[in-house]
């Protein structure tokens, strides 16, 4: 009976340890996925800001551009 108790406790302990390791790896994988998603979103924002900056530069450049004198005949 004593041998059976030790065996059961050993099996339960090893099962809990392996479950704990699997949960830890799962959390790490989820964190990596979140980091990847955040990096992709950041890249998209940088691209959008670059385009908006160019458009704003063109618009503002057109507004403050000196107008040419046009003479009518």
Swiss-Prot record:
* Major location (coarse): secreted
Q: Which residues form the signal peptide?
A: 1-22
Keywords, alphabetical = Amphibian defense peptide, Antibiotic, Antimicrobial, Immunity, Innate immunity, Secreted, Signal
Question: What tissues express this gene product?
Answer: Expressed by the skin glands.
- Gene Ontology cellular component terms for the protein in this record: extracellular region
Compartments reported by the entry = Secreted
Positions annotated as propeptide: 23-46
Ranges for region Disordered: 25-45
Quote the InterPro entries the UniProt record gives.
Frog_antimicrobial_propeptide, FSAP
Q: Does the record bear Coiled coil in its keywords?
A: no
GO terms in the biological process aspect are:
defense response to bacterium; innate immune response
Q: Where is the composition biased (Acidic residues)?
A: 30-42
Family label: Belongs to the frog skin active peptide (FSAP) family. Frenatin subfamily.
Known function: Antimicrobial peptide with activity against both Gram-positive and Gram-negative bacteria.
Q: What is this protein called?
A: Frenatin 3.1
Q: Which organism is it from?
A: Nyctimystes infrafrenatus
């Amino acid at each position: 009976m004593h041998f059976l108790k030790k065996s059961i406790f050993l099996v339960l302990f090893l099962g809990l340890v392996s479950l704990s390791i699997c949960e830890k790896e799962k959390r790490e994988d989820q964190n990596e996925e979140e980091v990847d998603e955040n990096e992709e979103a950041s890249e998209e924002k940088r691209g959008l800001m670059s385009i908006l900056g160019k458009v704003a530069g063109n618009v503002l450049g057109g507004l403050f551009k000196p107008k040419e004198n046009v003479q009518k005949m």
